Amino acid sequence: MKYKIVLDAGHGGSDSGNIGNGITEKEYSLLISNYIKERLDALGIENIVTRNTDRFLSDDDRVNIISSAFGNESNVIVLSNHLRNEDGEGLEVVYALRN
């Protein structure tokens, strides 16, 4: 099965996310998303990003971008972190183990 990956950098635009040491979560998530995209491109793995600049996306915007790119395909992986929790600390990585 060939995977298609959506890199969904959380936050953006007017939504900064959390701030630590003067750097916003939206900045980190965009940097990480763009880095992963470069690596996936180099490996020939099909992918899209929901945003590649500092702009706000609603949840509906994110869903529409994904649907426009891949429709209802079941082999899409979405990497995202835009939870609305102001008490969070640290880094979150979510992944699926599959056979």
Predicted segment positions?
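Catalytic-core environment of secreted peptidases
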Residues: M1-N21
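Active-site-proximal helix/loop segments of hydrolytic enzymes
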Residues: K2-K4, E27-N99
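Glycine- and acidic-residue-enriched helix-capping/strand-helix junction motifs
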Residues: G17-L31
